[in-house]
């Protein structure tokens, strides 16, 4: 496993990120990120750059960590989350897709029928090729999916981009997520419901929106939560026009110690808000390589919203099991919410 071996400046920057994260690791929840957010809110590239040391989780769980914020999902948190199962109602959170689904990337499909020699077992097999990233498939991003800008500071936790080859990544692959799963308390912050309907595509969700949705749901997002944020536009979100979280939400997510962030889009605003030219997709460009935040993109949240309203609560048990493909950058997934 390779560590960064770039310029002295890059090594110095990595050292600063490691020190900042290590110092923050023992702090009380909310102290570092909230103070930074109040003193220097993220409004553009420059303020985001200044926030990186406070946002970084490099070294928080040791120099060899490959789970990032999934470390917040402890066995105790999973046991606690099991109490969310009261009625047994199951809601799928992955979009159904197949041949004919628009916007699938690098997709091909072939069904092959067969009949064996006597006793003539008959059936069919299929072969699927799919790029799970993008807006058509519900998927989980591995921490090797997005590097620091240009890869100059490596990947999450300081791993070198040289670990990524044509055969996959030697570190931070999706198999690490698959080994522990995404299992815990889910919380839906239904921003669309609070605002009175689906957000116009291209809208930015702010920390104020998140806290308004918290109040409406009478919940508090906390350490180890699997956070779902609904903008309501669903498949209408695209790389051309899509709703998501403003960069100013990053300290909020860091402060709350969210384990997994899930959206009914890719989580970023498209096109990027004014001032974010170097960091146009902060949820991905900062969330993955600096926070070590596991992202669950393009979830189907309309059904979840309806179920929460009917059940009268906005918390539930979540189980999702990405595949254990070594070195993979992500996995299609169908998370299940259980009430």
What are these regions (language model features)?
Residues 18-19, 144:
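Intrinsically disordered, low-complexity segments enriched in polar/charged small residues
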């Amino acid at each position: 496993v390779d560590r960064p071996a770039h310029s002295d400046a890059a090594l110095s920057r990595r050292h600063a990120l490691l020190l900042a994260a290590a110092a923050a690791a023992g702090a009380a929840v909310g102290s570092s990120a909230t103070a930074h957010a109040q003193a220097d809110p993220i409004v553009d590239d420059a303020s985001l750059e200044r926030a990186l040391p406070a946002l970084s989780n490099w070294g928080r769980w040791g120099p060899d960590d490959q789970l990032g914020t999934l470390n917040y999902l402890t066995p105790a948190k999973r046991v606690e989350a099991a109490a969310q199962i009261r009625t047994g109602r199951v809601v799928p959170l992955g979009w159904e897709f197949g041949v004919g689904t628009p916007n699938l990337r690098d997709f091909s499909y072939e069904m092959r029928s067969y009949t064996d020699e006597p006793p003539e077992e008959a059936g069919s097999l299929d072969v699927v090729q799919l790029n799970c990233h993008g807006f058509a498939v519900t998927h989980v991003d591995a921490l090797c999916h997005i590097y620091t800008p240009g890869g100059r500071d490596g990947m999450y936790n300081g791993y070198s981009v040289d670990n990524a080859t044509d055969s996959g990544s030697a570190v931070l692959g999706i198999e690490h997520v698959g080994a522990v799963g995404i299992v815990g308390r889910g919380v839906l912050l239904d921003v669309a419901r609070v605002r009175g309907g689906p957000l116009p595509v291209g809208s930015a969700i702010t920390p104020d929106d998140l806290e308004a949705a918290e109040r409406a749901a009478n919940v508090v997002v906390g350490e180890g939560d699997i956070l779902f944020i609904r903008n309501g536009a669903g498949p209408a979100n695209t790389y051309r026009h899509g709703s998501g979280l403003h960069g100013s939400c990053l300290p909020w997510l860091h402060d709350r110690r969210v384990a997994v962030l899930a959206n009914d889009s890719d989580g970023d605003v498209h096109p990027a808000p004014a001032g974010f030219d170097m960091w146009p997709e902060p949820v991905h460009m900062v969330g993955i390589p600096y926070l070590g935040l596991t992202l669950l993109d393009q979830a189907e949240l309309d059904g979840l919203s309806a179920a929460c309203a009917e059940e009268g609560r906005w918390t539930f048990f979540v189980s999702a099991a990405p595949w254990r493909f070594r070195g993979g950058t992500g996995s299609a997934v169908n998370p299940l919410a259980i009430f």
